[in-house]
């Protein structure tokens, strides 16, 4: 009996999370931010690291925990998330100073990226998503998404950049030469 109750509780927990993320994204962001502040100590440092007169960029924004954390401290936040479903959650973010873009290119002239999201038991495993370089495996869903370099992303000075893109950080930095030399963000 206990095993059945535990399984049911686990399933309801997953559904509850899904429903909250789908229909109440701002509640999900607040909950994630509260949890992340306990787990990720660097979030507590943001008030001292983020310049309130400059732009902050969250590359690999996922559902927006860092976006929400950056929002009170930056003049404007640009959240970049290539996964269309997660970008949709970010677009529902209830703040006027947040802009959502879908993907970051490694070089000028690249206007589209292909995202490969692995399927596990027929469901997308968001944590396993990565840029497809034409060598994707069978159990993936492909998305073509608009891309922009970090240099083209912001037209005002950028003071802070967070990059979490599952091993493609150097690709992101390749498209940020001007931003890094002129703006010198943290």
Region locations from a protein language model:
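Phosphate/nucleotide-binding beta-alpha loop and adjacent structural elements of enzyme active sites
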Residues: 1-186
